[in-house]
Amino acid sequence: MIEILDQNRLEVFVNDVFWHTISKCKGVAFKGDLVSDLGLDSLEILDLASEFHFRFDMLSGEKEFYLLQYKTAELWKEYILKAANDPSKRFGFFTSGSSGKPKEILHDKHLLIQERDFWIDFTKAKGVVCLVPVRHIYGFIWGLLLGSRLKQAKFLGPNEWHKVSDVASENDVIVGHPVAWQQISAPFPHRFAISSTAPINRKLTEKLRSKNIKGINVYGSTETGAIAYQAWENEHFKLLPYWQKQGIKLNRAQKNYSI
């Protein structure tokens, strides 16, 4: 079986979801007995299991992975990893809820892998520095899927963004959003920067470019993944090669595209 998500990146994702779902455990590693070590009650365990069941499509198909029969975080992670690397299952995400209640979105893995492989070819990245939450599709694709493929990924929270110039290697892609870019003042020249989730100010991109930082804005959504990108020095967006415009509609090609 081809590895889609490796153990190291899985740990990052599981902890992110754990802290987001069980706020009292923020900063506590997901390990040990769920009750005696992590202090979870039955409702918290049910909430957390439901979250992982959805995000890894664990209860669908011929192979079901029902987490509530296991009492330790290690066994949960063992079966989450199996589901993550089962090509017949999907990855689940929640929309931001900006237009109402957050919606559940499930993506076939081969489509996310298609996007991962495009970005690796496009950026020529050797590693990733991720400044965005990995539970959202943007951070998941760039931080976890690219990171698992490249075997080189670093993850910085908001209180660590100032370290980016210290941890980024020359061939790393730095994945952020406008808020992160506004707060990063130290130069990190000759890196490739990615921005998404919201429009980025032109003056800010000009400032970053003056420090020899190349970058692009990525346009997309939880429902679609990335659709188009815009180089910081350009005015217009360019469709990713597997998106095809037909009239006023966009259709995604499954295969047979070239960069």
Spans of model-derived segments:
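Conserved ATP/PPi-binding loop(s) of AMP-dependent carboxylate-activating enzymes
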Residues: 239, 248-259
